[in-house]
Amino acid sequence: MSNKSKGNRAEQLVLDHLISKGMIGEIIETKMRLARGPRGAFLVPDVGEKLGDIFGLMEGKAVLVEVKAVESLTYSILKDHQHDNLRKWYQQGGVAVVAQVKSDGTMFIMPYPMMWIPGENITKYFKP
């Protein structure tokens, strides 16, 4: 299974779980738009900044989720812009979440920010 399909599967598992807990949400994907040119109309990707993998509402709060399909979740797995987006989301009063899905389907859903030490596996503090 490719990394992209593992990621898509992980995102769907997390979304389904959060919806079962009452969240109204969706997986954020690049949208296609219709563009017109001298030779007719055609579809092009509507490229915009993607804030995270899942966006939703839960208990009146905006939720942003970053999903990682990895066996060990360390600080460096998230890219700098992902840390920035999650931190800013949290600072503005939203709920920022990092979700880890292991290959066996075990899922960890953790609030962000965490007391993360770069290089440390944070899931040792959580039970599935």
Predicted regions and their residues:
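Acidic-basic catalytic patches of nuclease active cores, encompassing PD-(D/E)XK
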Residues: M1-P45
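Amphipathic coiled-coil/heptad-repeat helices and related helical stalk/stem segments
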Residues: E11, K50, K79-Q82
